[in-house]
């Protein structure tokens, strides 16, 4: 295994799995997106829509009650389970046959939510993507890393990463700190940036797609949904991270001639995913 690898189209083709012509939505996998709080339901809309647009057969959103109408109207393809609380998640409780879970988008850090997240981590064994406020809660309770399932995928931007590992003086030191956590807990980190890097306990991967258009609100929520979808489709976690990051960046490259940088928004990532997939399989 190489210690460093650039993610280009050939690397993606080696990992991409064509969809069987006899498949059905059950085989395409059921993904759960857990998140949302009052005023931040857009994050769940983006993540869950990206999740189903990326190929998951079924997607359910677990959200506080205040978000039910928002998600059902915005993404009619996505099912909804609501928490008993109106404005934040206080108990994560569901009975579903799932293949993957993404948690954290727009979730907030209410004490009730932190307690619910802890109890969820103690019982969850499914492939997991951890983003946004779930990362921030982890950074305040670093010992909870030991509760994560093997190959859990953490998707921090630079500030979220700093809260998790502390400050660094160079890129080399940053990667070394991340690598230590990967080795200790068998994790995968998606270090969002320019370029985005993916780190596990064996290798570091550098993405080659994307541009400055991705520096927009909700871009990370969409990425979390894409990776959660690929996990639901039974991709190995490292391949889900690699393909997800590549597709996410590729949408910005494809859209640039039409919308430029400034006018590109997170919803454009979702709308361009079909073209990105076609670029891979052409």
UniProtKB/Swiss-Prot annotation:
Matches recorded under InterPro entries: Carbohydrate_kinase_pred_CS (IPR017953), CARKD (IPR000631), Ribokinase-like (IPR029056)
Pfam families: Carb_kinase (PF01256)
Binding site for AMP: 220
Keyword Cytoplasm attributed: no
Family annotation (SUPFAM superfamilies): Ribokinase-like (SSF53613)
Sequence ranges assigned to domain YjeF C-terminal in this UniProt record: 8-280
Any GO MF annotation of the entry: NAD(P)HX epimerase activity
GO BP of this protein: metabolite repair; nicotinamide nucleotide metabolic process
Residues involved in (6S)-NADPHX binding: 106, 157, 221
Disulfide bonds: none
Functional summary from the UniProt entry: Catalyzes the dehydration of the S-form of NAD(P)HX at the expense of ADP, which is converted to AMP. Together with NAD(P)HX epimerase, which catalyzes the epimerization of the S- and R-forms, the enzyme allows the repair of both epimers of NAD(P)HX, a damaged form of NAD(P)H that is a result of enzymatic or heat-dependent hydration.
UniProt family annotation: Belongs to the NnrD/CARKD family.
The protein, known as: ADP-dependent (S)-NAD(P)H-hydrate dehydratase
Species name: Flavobacterium psychrophilum (strain ATCC 49511 / DSM 21280 / CIP 103535 / JIP02/86)
Encoding gene, per UniProt annotation: nnrD
């Amino acid at each position: 295994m190489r210690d460093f690898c650039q993610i280009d189209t050939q690397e993606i083709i080696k990992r991409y799995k064509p969809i069987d012509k006899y498949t059905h939505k059950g085989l395409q996998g059921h993904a759960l997106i857990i998140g949302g709080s009052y005023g931040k339901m857009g994050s769940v809309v983006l993540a869950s829509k990206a999740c189903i647009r990326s190929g998951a057969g079924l997607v359910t959103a677990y959200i506080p009650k205040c978000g039910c109408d928002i998600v059902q109207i915005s993404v009619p393809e996505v099912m909804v389970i609501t928490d008993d609380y109106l404005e934040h998640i206080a108990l994560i409780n569901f009975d579903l046959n799932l293949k993957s879970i993404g948690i954290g988008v727009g979730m907030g850090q209410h004490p009730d939510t932190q307690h619910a997240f802890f109890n969820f981590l103690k019982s969850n064994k499914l492939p997991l993507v951890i983003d946004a406020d779930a990362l921030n809660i982890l950074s305040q309770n670093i010992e909870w890393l030991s509760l994560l399932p093997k190959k859990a995928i953490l998707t921090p931007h630079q500030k979220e990463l700093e809260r998790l590992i502390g400050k660094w003086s160079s890129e080399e030191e940053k990667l070394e700190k991340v690598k230590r956590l990967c080795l200790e807990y068998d994790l995968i980190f998606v270090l969002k940036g320019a370029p985005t890097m993916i780190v596990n306990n064996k290798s570091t991967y550098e993405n080659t797609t994307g541009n400055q258009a991705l520096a927009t609100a909700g871009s990370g929520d969409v990425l979390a949904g894409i990776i959660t979808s690929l996990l639901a489709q039974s991709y190995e976690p490292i391949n889900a991270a690699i393909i997800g990051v590549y597709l996410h960046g590729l949408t910005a490259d494809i859209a640039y001639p039409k919308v430029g940088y400034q006018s590109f928004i997170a919803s454009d990532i979702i709308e361009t995913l079909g073209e990105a997939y076609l670029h891979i399989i052409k």
